[in-house]
Amino acid sequence: MTEVQSITTSGEIKMPLSPSSSSSSISSSTTNNTNIKSIPILSQCYSFSGKGNGKELQDKIFRQNSRHSNGGWKFVDDIELKKQRGVCWSLVKSVGNSIIEGKELTSTCLPIELFEARSFLEKVTDTMAFGPLYLKAAAETNDPIERMKMVASFVVSGLHLTTTIAKPFNPLLGETFECDLADGSSAFCEQISHHPPISSWKLLEKDGKYKYTGHFIWSAGCRGNVVKGCLKGPHNIEFADGTNIAFTYPDVLIKGIFWGDRVTEFCGKMLFTDEKNDLACELIFNPNALGFVKSFFSKQKTPCDTIDGRIFRINNNKIKDGNCDKINPDDVLCKMEGTWLTSFLIDQVEYWNIRMIPHGVIYRDPETTLPTDSGRRDDIKHLKMGNLEEAKKYKALIEDNQRKQKKEKDEKLKKDEKLKKEDKKNQK
């Protein structure tokens, strides 16, 4: 494995910020081979130049986190963690134990101290940070298998960038966010539903080589000391030759909400399908995970950020609801391994590693964006400026207005339903 990690004196695994910033290294748990070859395009991402926010975003992630000795991002900002936990305990006292017994958090009014100064719509674009590298390469190849490899690498490459400790603001119905990517692609996000919260997006390559569309139906619930987040919904990358690769996202676990190490992990499976070329790709996150009881008596064999996967012919392999229970070994075309915090290998060739610097997105001039843009929200603007009390005030005003609009909408629906029933009765 190439040198992508260094060990701290406490035994934790620390991520370097550049290819040369690590003086000591360890080999990944997935392989002991020190002669791993990388695909050529990776060399484009070992230095940063351009207008994108990728380096700033990644530097923030590296400042806040280090890789836990058992895998996963461990949050290391003790001051921020102490502040957040104080707010969380206050929340439990004010709303009762329902908050730690599985109550849906997306419909819960949370204190502003738990938020970062941006909307979830902007956070969605963090997953697109490596788009100019991988999606361009995917669009330019004529090999369907290589294209599937690039799309899978694109998704894996962005996972470590999504694990910020602070919560983004819930978007308002009709809220938008727009930005550009380094290759000239443009992204547009919109909140299309409030209950349930649904965020949609469209990423368009400037010459029509690819189009990435989809939406997240997002939910989160707390169980004791753990929050589980789910991002359901379709993701489709359509290429100029008519190929469409559809895929799903894994769930996320945030452990240590109230006590212990604050660690973020991904769990479950991702399934990519290319029906035109009879191809599929399955990625399993934390494949050797132990159950709750077993974890008390046994030590897990591999880090929890481990990924195991394969690309295979769909043929007669049954795919249902985003899952493929059993894959015929004869249909497997290549194997994948690695972790979402070190490197990602496909048939022992490196397709991504943590030393790579993402392009990120380029923000547009606020004067050119729509009036509904996230950046125009008063609560977000004041939080960015550090005006906590003003941010609280505007957040409360926005939430009161949302409740009022919902009440008016519900009353109108009831009234319309009543009129329909009366019309039917009169017709008889």
From Swiss-Prot:
GO terms for cellular component: cytosol; membrane. Residues 389-422 form a coiled coil. Residues 1-11 have a biased composition (Polar residues). InterPro entries: OSBP_sf, Oxysterol-bd. GO terms for molecular function: sterol binding. Keywords: Coiled coil. Residues 18-32 have a biased composition (Low complexity). Residues 1-32, 396-428 are annotated as: Disordered. Belongs to the OSBP family. This is Oxysterol-binding protein 9. It comes from Dictyostelium discoideum (Social amoeba).
